[in-house]
Structure formats: C-alpha cells, structure tokens
C-alpha cells in the first residue's frame, strides 16, 4: 500500500484513481501529476516502484496544495469572508446556504433538524 501525502492509497486501484483519495486531487489533477512524473495511468498502485512513488510525492509536494494545508487555506478563506462582513461571510456565520439557494422549504442540510414554531395552546 503506497503512502503519498499522508494518505494510504488502495492497492488494487489504478494509480490515476488511487491519487483521487488525496484531498485536493481530482481525476484531472491526478493525470497532470502522472504526466509530469512520466507514469502510465494504467498502472496499479501495488505495481508502483519506490522511485515512481517518490516521483509522485515530489511532484505533489512542489506543485500542489493538498490535505492539511488545503483544508487550512479553505478555512482561512471562509474566516476572512466572515471577518469582512460580506454577504457570503454572513451566510457562513448563520449556517445558511451561501450560493443563492432558496431556504423557505429546503436547505435542511445547512439548517439542521426542523424546529416547530407556533404550536402554543391558548
């Protein structure tokens, strides 16, 4: 099992799909990394030699932001929006959808479980 960027890649998958288990690497970026390292997409993770794994590690470390650094960067970007007081920052702070979705009936994932209002007795 190859360990790249702190993530254990599944042995039986093709390397182009195995790299997508790393946060911040999708299929397109995975193929870019493999092209730069000179490795075939068809190779399985368990077939990688130590030199090939090192080439992938080097490419990711030098040219891509992944895993913890990327998570930290995203969190800081969201915090900056909230500190600015922008509309998007306010939506993040209130836990509501940020990208313009309607909230009268939907948005249950962001808003949480329903809170019943107005069932008071006289």
Curated annotation (Swiss-Prot):
> Which keywords, in A-to-Z order, does the entry hold?
Ribonucleoprotein, Ribosomal protein, RNA-binding, rRNA-binding, tRNA-binding
For this protein, the record's HAMAP family field holds: Ribosomal_uS13
Give the originating organism: Campylobacter concisus (strain 13826)
A GO molecular function annotation here is: tRNA binding
**What is the name attached to this protein's record?**
Small ribosomal subunit protein uS13
Q: How does it assemble?
A: Part of the 30S ribosomal subunit. Forms a loose heterodimer with protein S19. Forms two bridges to the 50S subunit in the 70S ribosome.
Q: Where is this region: Disordered?
A: 95-122
Xref: Gene3D superfamilies: 1.10.8.50, 30s ribosomal protein s13, domain 2 (4.10.910.10)
User: Carries keyword Ribosomal protein?
Assistant: yes
A Pfam family found in this protein is: Ribosomal_S13
Please, one GO biological process term? translation
Its family?
Belongs to the universal ribosomal protein uS13 family.
Q: Which InterPro entries match?
A: Rbsml_uS13_C, Ribosomal_uS13, Ribosomal_uS13-like_H2TH, Ribosomal_uS13_bac-type, Ribosomal_uS13_CS
Biased-composition ranges, Basic residues, are 95-116
* One Gene Ontology CC term in the entry: cytosol
What job does the chain carry out?
Located at the top of the head of the 30S subunit, it contacts several helices of the 16S rRNA. In the 70S ribosome it contacts the 23S rRNA (bridge B1a) and protein L5 of the 50S subunit (bridge B1b), connecting the 2 subunits; these bridges are implicated in subunit movement. Contacts the tRNAs in the A and P-sites.
């Amino acid at each position: 099992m190859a360990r790249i960027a702190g993530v254990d890649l599944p042995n039986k998958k093709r390397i182009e799909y195995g790299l997508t288990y790393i946060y911040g690497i999708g299929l397109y970026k995975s193929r870019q990394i493999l092209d730069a390292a000179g490795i075939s997409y068809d190779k399985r993770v368990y077939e990688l030699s130590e030199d090939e794994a090192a080439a992938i590690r080097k490419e990711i470390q030098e040219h891509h932001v992944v895993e913890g650094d990327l998570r930290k960067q995203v969190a800081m970007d969201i915090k900056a929006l909230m500190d600015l007081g922008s509309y998007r920052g306010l939506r993040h702070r209130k836990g509501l959808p940020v990208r313009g979705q309607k909230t009268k009936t939907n948005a249950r994932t962001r808003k949480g479980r329903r809170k019943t209002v107005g069932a008071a007795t006289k």
